[in-house]
Amino acid sequence: MKQKLTLRRVLVSTVAALAAAAAVWLLCRWVGYDLQLRIGNEPVYEIANDDYTRIIDVPEDGLWQTVPLEAGQTLYGCRLRFSTHGELYRAGMVMVDLCDADGTILREAAGNYANIFDDNFTGFAFGTAYTAAQAETLCLHIYNVVEWEGPLGLWASTGTVGAMSLTADGVDADATLALQYMTDDSGSWPSDLANGLAPLLAFAAFAAVLLFGLRAPLPLTVAVVGLACGLLFVRVTPALVAPDEYTHLAAAYELASRLGGETPADENGCLLVRESDAPHFGTRSGEIGILAYKAEALARQKEAGGPDALTAVSEAKAGQGSGNYLPQAVGIRLARNAGANFYTMLRQARTFNLIFYLLLAVLAVALAPAALRGLLACIALLPMPLQLAGSLSPDASVLGMVFCYTALCLRLRTKKAVWWEKILLIALGGAVGPAKAIYLPVVLLCFIIPVDNLVGPTEFVRGSFGVRVRSGQLIREAVLVLAGGLWLSANLGELAYAARDMNQMLLAVGAVGIVLLLALVRWLYGKVQNDAKKLRLLKGALACAVALAVVGGVLALSRMGGGLAPDQLLMTNPNGDSIWTFSLGYICRNLPATAKLLLRTIPAQGALWLQGILGTTLGEPIVYRIDVSWLLGVGLVLALLAAALPVQDEQSKPLLGRRTGFGVLGIILCVAASSLVVALNWTPINYETLFGMQGRYWLPVLPLVLLLVKGSRSVCARRDLSRGAALAVTACTLLTLLQGYSLYASWQPVS
């Protein structure tokens, strides 16, 4: 029952929203403060001279150490190795000035004797960094400015190292100080970046609580809250750190070049890029850490863009693009037309991808039956979909399309389709087919729609071979044919590669035979469906045929290919991985070994798969393991289960019947099996667990899993909890963003 909007509800909701925004703002400030204490003002040093064998005391006039700098080289300070001759001094001050060739002081740094220890390096940070405009030689002037208790020495080499001469009292000391350049410094960036996230985080919390309190339409909630959280992921995820983002960048960039009528690759298949973009194209994930955040922020502000002229050859290969990259490519195209620099272009491409995902997600929530809108809203606002949407990943658009198709099929299960819904069903089914190979089984959801709901003004039409069929059945067949045809055109090469060690002609004949048998079974079912005795005979015969086909198929496939000689089994790459992977032939010929690998994988990677579905593991988990608190994962699981609970007094019959539920379960299992087979194709045969399998691959069928939970009615809620669950999911997503930023910023490479 729709509740009336009262002034009291508006005031209470506004106050609660302001309180939530204030709490999130304070929490964000705390994260910045904590990070500043832990990783703020942390320098990075580069060795300039590590050869030191003697001690030179600092004379009254000080020491003058020449420092050659290259054009563009930045110096934040330096670090020197002191000697106190075994003493512990309590008084004295050492100055380190950076001077030009004329002795003009460019930068200054000071150090207290109390912080200088015998035979230890001591850092001196300048007030501001110095960047050489051109190649030049500067000097470090090291001297005392107040009385000190005793002699203070500096370790130096015997003999001058390179062009780094040392002068003491105007005389060449024939030495070079033990010296390290301070090449970078985290400064106040940890707190500054956190403070920059605070307004958007506070707005997301404010909007979520306000819309919940006002009981706003769920599509509006997904649009507003999803946009705020997605833009936060755009900012929090470091450049090229999202899953496979460097590959997606190359594909989207290539498509953007084609949209502009440009030649995207050279004769060797390497991607052509703008001169200003070339340094950022590679074949590995980007860097993380506070210094990576800092470098990205400074580059976005200061780095020059350039004209849209593809004059540089990158390391990335062309030929990875598809229609799934269209939103990202449009963002890149517009940024290049405007002459934007690389990081501005990257952020714009991410934003376009986010907007396209949100359009599809909002459409899915709007299309879904009223009882399922809250459930779909919860899934759409999970951290993982928003993280993918806030990157260059084409999986975001695939997610949106599958969500829309699922919602439309469930919608048409309970109502008669109008003309635009029929067109949308065919279009979405055709789009889901080639979107990603493993999601083809989802197209079968069109069979949960009763034929009567798809029948048009003319109930019967002429089909293939002049057969008289119902128009609704023709629509379902059109969806299957379109999706299957586009799937084959998009994935035939990958399918041939997976079956590379099998007789592909026999496989093709077998596939055609299976299709013809299915068509025969469908025709026979139409003939006997109204005769109970004949229908039982058909089902019995079909069960026997399936059992014989499975046994015979396994025996046939296990002898068709996949055999490797002993010397072939020993062939490995330099890193120790076998050069052979689990092809279809190898899988069929080695079913016990495949089963053992899968059984070992489940306990080893099961928790990571769940994290991948929810989004509590960030970035590319194969490269960086950025895992937020398991408490957030528990909160997200509980929120999803709450959204899936049926309402106790709900009088309407379940959305899925028993037989339909088994069919949906079969679709889920087919998608899971397909993803495992694909991951096996990436896995070397000497691995003990799967390689490359990630939980996010199962995210498109998560609505179906929760739909089965909702239909069980084993546990019921007194009232609909989906709106509160969506608010809880939003809260967990915001906390994931905050902790994710903290983990990204504080990450340190393993030494």
Can you say where each PLM-predicted feature lies in the sequence?
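Start-transfer (signal-anchor) and selected internal transmembrane alpha helices
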Residues: M1-R29, W189-L231, L524, V528-L548, ...
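Beta-sheet-rich sandwich/jelly-roll-like modules and their strand-loop junctions
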Residues: R9-V12, A21-D100, I116-T137, Y143-L201
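Membrane-lumen/periplasm interface segments of multi-pass, membrane-embedded glycan/lipid transferases
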Residues: G187-S191, F460-A543, G552-V647
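Transmembrane-helix signature of polytopic, membrane-embedded enzymes
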Residues: A216-L220, A340-Y343, A364-P383
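Interfacial juxtamembrane loops and adjacent helix segments
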Residues: L259-Q348
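Membrane-interface alpha helices of multi-pass inner-membrane proteins
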Residues: Q387, E421-A437, V442-I448, L482
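Short acidic/glycine- and proline-prone juxtamembrane loop motifs at membrane-interface regions
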Residues: S391-V398
